[in-house]
Regions:
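Active-site and donor-binding regions of nucleotide-sugar-utilizing enzymes
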Residues: 18-121
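Membrane-interacting alpha-helical segments
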Residues: 2-9, 13-16, 20
Length: 121
């Protein structure tokens, strides 16, 4: 029941989230560059990739050795939640791996995300 109420509230707030994203995007263009990621779209199709989520800049820096360990034959997607995290992740890993914003926590967006990417781990 709680999840249903959460999803309904989230759905009602989506216009506010988009407005907030546009305001942030006016200050930091990176927020707008991957706006489709926020709704579960705009990803490059990969072959059973490994998803690593690093919320912020500190976590992006912290996964460096982990990413090196998993590289090789594995396709890796690095997801972030902040513009500074995205910028640093693109700088460190963007030449070899896909770097994206994780979609907003709404079941439709998350389902689109996982269905399209077909994540292995």
């Amino acid at each position: 029941m709680f999840l249903f109420i959460y999803q309904i509230c989230f759905f009602c707030l989506i216009p506010i989230f988009f407005l907030n994203l546009l305001i942030k995007g006016a200050k930091q263009k990176l927020y707008l560059s991957k706006i489709s990621n926020r709704i579960g779209l705009g990803f490059k199709k990969r072959n059973n990739p490994i998803l690593i989520h690093a919320v912020s800049l500190g976590e992006v820096l912290g996964i460096k050795n982990f990413v090196k360990t998993l590289e090789g034959d594995n396709e890796i997607i690095i997801s972030v939640s902040t513009a500074t995290g995205l910028q640093k992740a693109q700088e460190l890993y963007g030449h070899k791996h896909q770097v994206i914003f994780l979609p907003w926590d709404f079941f439709i967006f998350i389902n689109l995300f996982f269905r399209f990417l077909d994540i292995k781990l």
